[in-house]
C-alpha cells in the first residue's frame, strides 16, 4: 500500500481511538473544562460538527502524512516509536501554541483542572502515537 494512504488511514484509526477516549473522559465527568471539540468550535463559528471534522482532518491527514513522511524508505520496520514521537510533538505543539490560540495559558494551567490538563493530554497523545505507529506498521507491511 502507498505509504501516504497508509499514513492517512492509520491517522484516522488513531483519531477514532483518541476521540473515544475523549468521549469516555467526558462521560466520566473528568476535566469538564477541557473539551477540545468545543474549543475548536469556538474558533470556527461555533459548530461542533465542523470542529469534529477539523479534528479528524488534523489527526488523519496531518498526522498521517507526518508519519508517512518521517518513515523514510525502509518500510520493513516497526513504527510504534516513531508514532510515539509524533504524538509527543503534537502534544507539545498543542500545549505551547494551540492552547494560547484558544485563549488559555500554555499547558492549560489557568484552567480549573490545572495540572491534569497537560498530564492527561500527554497520555492521550502517547496512546494516539502508539495506535498511529502500530496501524501504520500493519498497513505498510501489507
Give the location of each predicted region:
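Juxtamembrane/disordered regions of integral membrane proteins
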Residues: 1-142
